[in-house]
Amino acid sequence: MNIVLINHYAGSPEMGMEFRPYYFAREWIKQGHNVVILSADYSHLRRKNPAISKDFQKERIDGIQYYWIHTNEYEGNGFKRAITMAQFIGKLFLGARNIVKYVKPDIVICSSTYPLDTYVGQYIRKLSKKKVTLVHEVHDMWPISP
């Protein structure tokens, strides 16, 4: 099965938080699935952010295929952070046809801390010629939760 996990802040043990997507992906790969994580190149949660030169730049980490989307840097929970959310979602919408064409997802999991990624997941599902399962994982509702 081809699994696409959308998480703006996904990281790895080397980079730092957010770890949840990384550990899910590792387990799915052990079960024989292909996993792609779509994440922003900048996160205030990480110790180390990836250095990328273009949107959708690929990097394989412990067998997990990451696609990095460039977003601006920010500090805190202010307006600049909200702008990066719009950047991330907008670029995913623009890249959705290529995600469908090259990744061929069977399941799309939307797992960011804000609900806008669900709209991208719905769009990817709509563009796909096959039946795609869409899952929205609610684990933190910024800015409602501290």
Residue positions per predicted region:
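Short N-terminal targeting/anchoring amphipathic segment
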Residues: 65-67, 96-117, 131-135
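A conserved catalytic-core segment of Leloir-type glycosyltransferases
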Residues: 38-100
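Conserved strand-to-helix beginnings and helix N-cap segments that scaffold or border functional pockets
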Residues: 17-18, 79, 118-119
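N-terminal subdomain of nucleotide-sugar transferases
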Residues: 1-65
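Short, well-ordered beta-to-alpha junction loops that form the rim of enzyme active sites
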Residues: 8, 41, 111-113, 139
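A short acidic, amphipathic alpha-helical/loop segment
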Residues: 120-124
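Short catalytic/ligand-binding loop motif for oxyanion handling, primarily in non-cytosolic enzymes
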Residues: 45-46, 116-118, 144
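Acceptor-binding helix/loop patch of EC 2.4 sugar-transfer enzymes
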Residues: 8, 12-13, 73-82, 102-103, ...
